[in-house]
A protein has these predicted regions:
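Glycine/small-residue-rich interface belts in oligomeric ring/scaffold proteins
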Residues: 2, 16-79
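Internal, well-folded beta-alpha domain core
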Residues: 64-135
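Residues in well-ordered beta-strands of folded domains
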Residues: 7, 60-62, 98
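Charged, low-complexity intrinsically disordered regulatory segments in eukaryotic signaling
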Residues: 1-7
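Structural motif
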Residues: 12, 58, 94-96
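Short helix/loop capping segments that flank catalytic or ligand/cofactor-binding pockets
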Residues: 15-16, 108
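Short polar catalytic/cofactor-binding loops
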Residues: 8-14
């Protein structure tokens, strides 16, 4: 069994799993679905494409720095309406994520993709870019 380690750090992160409508919450650590989305973006997998190849990964998360919960009062406008949302982020948090897989070649492919991503990478939400040196 081989493992690929990722250091997830950035000014803000948001790992929402029950975010709906006006309130967008975050978990205290990266979610498996959030990390899967990050990996899919790195690999260039489109939203409508199959991501089952990522199901073979086992995930573990270590919190190296908890960070602080940040609340953002957010307004957005369309032609007809204004929307007010409250979004929560983790500020200055650092996590070490371990991805375990029996297929070492697949982990090497992921490592390359994370160093040369097909799409921009984010820590949960589009407004959350990662620091350099994730892998």
């Amino acid at each position: 069994m081989s493992t690929l380690l990722l250091r997830l750090a950035g000014p803000v992160q948001s790992w929402g799993i029950d975010s709906k409508f006006e309130v967008r919450r975050t978990e205290n650590a990266p979610s498996k679905s959030g990390v899967t989305g990050l990996l899919a973006a790195a690999l260039g997998i489109q939203r409508n494409e199959d991501i089952s190849s990522l199901n073979q990964l086992r995930l573990g998360v270590r919190t190296d720095q908890e960070g602080r919960l940040l609340k953002d009062f957010h307004t957005a406008h369309s032609e007809k309406n204004s929307y007010i949302t409250t979004r929560y982020y983790l500020s200055d948090a650092i996590f070490l994520v371990g991805l375990e897989c029996e297929d070492k070649g697949f982990l090497q492919k992921l490592e390359y993709a994370l160093k040369h991503p097909a799409f921009p990478l984010f820590l949960g939400r589009r407004s959350c870019p990662p620091e350099a040196g994730m892998v």
